[in-house]
């Protein structure tokens, strides 16, 4: 059985939350914020190979027109900023995701992971 790397899962989840933001779909999707916050503790976001992986994943996802954040005109860095500043996933996180967690991680703590990613510039020009 082949297992996807944490880095690939991380990148896919970033694109996924951006797609959900662009399609205005929060329902049961805030779980990705929690997942990202946990994965971020296990990977090195300054690994140069991660930038290449992001580019490869974007090119792969771009083929699917429903993957809005992978299209050429999408700016993932800016989308992440909007997700944080608008608290787009907060209600769903508090009403759905937080009830599913074995270890409680509140929204404000989970969303800090996106701010770390924004500050790193990892998705700048992506």
Task: Briefly describe each language-model feature range.
Residues 1-126:
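Structured mid-to-C-terminal alpha-helical surface segments
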